[in-house]
C-alpha cells in the first residue's frame, strides 16, 4: 500500500509559473467491520491498518486486550473490479464477546466536530474506561519532556516529503521513544500507536507519555484515558473539553510544548 503519490503542479513564485512534481500524502477510506457488520469508516493514510483498527476498538471500549481479538483480515473483492482494495477490514472478536451495538459505537467520537454534549461525553468515557491513569505515580522530568518534540519531528519520515501528516509517539517516562506513527488524521495516528501497544501487550500504558504533533482535542484526551496513559503532551493548544476530561481522569495535560517552555494544565505534580 502506498502512503504517497506524485502529481505535477504549477508553482508560482516571483511572477514565474514553474511546472514541477510534488509528493502528496495518500488519503483513503478504511471501513472497519466487527463480525461482518460495519462499525465506522475513517479517512486514513494506508499502513498499520490492523493497529488502527485495534486501537480504535480499544478506545471505543469494545475490546480491552489483545486476547479479545480472534483475527483481523482484509475483505477480498471490495474494489470496483472485484480485487482487494485493502480499504475494508473485518475484526472477529474472541469467543464470548458479543458484536457491539451500532448505536453504542456511534456514541463515540471519531471527529472533533461531532457536536456531542460535553457532559454526556465525560460520563460516557468514565463508564467504559478499563484503566485509571489517576493512580499512576509516574513522573517526567521537564527537560525530558521538552526534548520529545525534536525526537518526534526527527522520526516523521513521510512528513519530510509531503508536509501533510500528523504524528503521534509513545515515550517511556525516561524519554525513550517506543513507537511513532504518521497519518493524515491525528486521531488515526493515536489509534495506530495504541493499537501497537495492544499488540505488544503493554496495556495499560503506565509510566508513558503520548505526544501529538498538533492540538490536544477531546477525542485525543479520551483515547489517552482509555489506554491508561498518564501524560498527554501536545505541541499546539488544548481544547477546553480536553482539559476538563484530563482533570476528571487524573491525566497530566501539557500543551504548547517547546524546547524551553510548556503549559501544564492538569496534574502538574507529575512534571519535575
UniProtKB/Swiss-Prot annotation:
Q: Which GO terms describe its molecular function?
A: sulfur carrier activity; sulfurtransferase activity
Q: Does the keyword Cytoplasm apply?
A: yes
- One GO location term (cellular component): cytoplasm
* Keyword set, alphabetical order: Cytoplasm, Molybdenum cofactor biosynthesis
Which Gene3D superfamilies has this protein been placed in? 3.10.20.10, Cytidine Deaminase, domain 2
> Pfam families in the record, alphabetically?
FdhD-NarQ (PF02634)
Mention one GO biological process in which this protein takes part, according to its record: Mo-molybdopterin cofactor biosynthetic process
The subcellular location is:
Cytoplasm
Q: Which residues form the signal peptide?
A: none
Residues passing through the membrane, by range: none
Where is this protein primarily located?
Answer: cytoplasm
Active-site residues, record numbering mapped to chain:
114 (cysteine persulfide intermediate)
Q: What does this protein do?
A: Required for formate dehydrogenase (FDH) activity. Acts as a sulfur carrier protein that transfers sulfur from IscS to the molybdenum cofactor prior to its insertion into FDH.
Q: What PANTHER family does the entry give?
A: FORMATE DEHYDROGENASE (PTHR30592), SULFUR CARRIER PROTEIN FDHD (PTHR30592:SF1)
> What family classification does the UniProt entry report for this protein?
Belongs to the FdhD family.
Know the name of this protein? Sulfur carrier protein FdhD
Source species:
Mycolicibacterium paratuberculosis (strain ATCC BAA-968 / K-10) (Mycobacterium paratuberculosis)
